[in-house]
């Protein structure tokens, strides 16, 4: 499938030779970043912060979406309960990052697609409950295209297939500008989830798409996610002639 990358290096800063007019921003334009290599968590966090800062200071500056993979790590949302870490803090098997998103501890690793969306909800809908449900629907729509039934569970956030959670959602929002987003387990090693209570849900079962579609790879799913995000949030991808 087409893995063409429409991007500009985030390290250079979102204002580097970018001229996004109010008319473009109002049509919900966004830059799409699909790094070819696995990205350290702290690097991607820095990219998001750059765009977040610029969107807060100038609402018509570029929005951005990333679809990428991380090296193995754990992340904890604001207010996460450390009792959900099944190891001593000073003896962690993997890096642990405390970040400004909702939700409890989760696990990132290669073979899992992480989607980060830095969007100005003033250009979409200023409703966080709506936004969470839309992110879930992005994943459910992709699963439907793959012939897998994805579903929500009443009172919880995320996406399940049968009795296994395959997609997680965790967002931050400041002045109606979002950060963080979703993760979807594709063909990853799930052993790291044994070291935590995922999302604070005791006895939750975690699954991956390869449980239902043996041999499926990240490169098979990324284009579907790209189109699902674009369609759900009515985005137009801005093309930049520079690669990560």
From Swiss-Prot:
Alphabetic keyword roster: Acyltransferase, Cytoplasm, Transferase
GO cellular component assignments: cytoplasm
Disordered, as annotated region: 1-21
Site (Lowers pKa of active site Cys): 165
EC number, UniProt record: 2.3.1.181
Positions bound to substrate: 101-108, 168-170, 181-183
Pathway: Protein modification; protein lipoylation via endogenous pathway; protein N(6)-(lipoyl)lysine from octanoyl-[acyl-carrier-protein]: step 1/2
InterPro entries listed in its UniProt record: aa-tRNA-synth_II/BPL/LPL, BPL_LPL_catalytic, Octanoyltransferase, Octanoyltransferase_CS
Active site: 199 (acyl-thioester intermediate)
Record localization: Cytoplasm
Chain ranges of the BPL/LPL catalytic domain: 59-244
Enzyme type, top EC level: transferase
Any Pfam family the entry gives: LplA-B_cat
GO terms of molecular function: lipoyl(octanoyl) transferase activity
Recorded catalytic activity of this chain's protein: octanoyl-[ACP] + L-lysyl-[protein] = N(6)-octanoyl-L-lysyl-[protein] + holo-[ACP] + H(+)
SUPFAM superfamilies (UniProt xref): Class II aaRS and biotin synthetases
Origin superkingdom: Bacteria
Main localization category: cytoplasm
Composition skew (Polar residues), residue ranges: 9-21
GO biological process: protein modification process
Function of the molecule: Catalyzes the transfer of endogenously produced octanoic acid from octanoyl-acyl-carrier-protein onto the lipoyl domains of lipoate-dependent enzymes. Lipoyl-ACP can also act as a substrate although octanoyl-ACP is likely to be the physiological substrate.
Family matches, as NCBIfam families: lipB
Similarity comment: Belongs to the LipB family.
Miscellaneous remark of the record: In the reaction, the free carboxyl group of octanoic acid is attached via an amide linkage to the epsilon-amino group of a specific lysine residue of lipoyl domains of lipoate-dependent enzymes.
Record-given protein name: Octanoyltransferase
Designated gene of the protein: lipB
């Amino acid at each position: 499938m087409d893995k063409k990358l429409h991007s500009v290096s985030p390290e250079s800063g979102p204002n580097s030779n970018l001229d996004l007019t109010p008319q473009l921003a109002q049509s919900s334009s966004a830059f799409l970043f699909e790094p070819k290599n696995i990205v350290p968590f702290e690097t991607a966090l820095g990219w998001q912060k750059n765009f977040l800062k610029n969107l807060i200071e100038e609402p018509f500056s570029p929005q951005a979406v990333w679809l990428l993979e991380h090296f193995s790590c754990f992340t904890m949302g604001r207010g996460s309960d450390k009792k959900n870490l099944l190891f001593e803090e000073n003896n962690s098997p993997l890096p642990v990052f405390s970040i400004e998103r909702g939700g409890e501890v989760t696990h990132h690793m290669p073979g899992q697609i992480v989607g980060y969306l830095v969007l100005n909800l003033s250009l979409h809908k200023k409703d966080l409950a709506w936004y969470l449900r839309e992110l879930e629907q992005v994943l459910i729509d992709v699963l439907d295209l793959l012939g897998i039934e994805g579903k929500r569970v009443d009172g919880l956030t995320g996406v399940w297939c049968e009795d296994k959670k395959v997609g997680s959602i965790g967002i931050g929002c400041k002045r109606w500008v979002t950060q963080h987003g979703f993760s979807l387990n594709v063909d990853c090693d799930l052993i790291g989830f044994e070291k935590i209570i995922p999302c604070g849900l005791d006895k939750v079962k975690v699954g991956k798409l390869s449980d239902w579609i043996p041999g499926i790879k990240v490169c098979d799913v990324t284009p579907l996610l790209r189109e699902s995000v674009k369609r759900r949030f009515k985005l137009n991808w801005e093309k930049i002639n520079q690669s990560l």
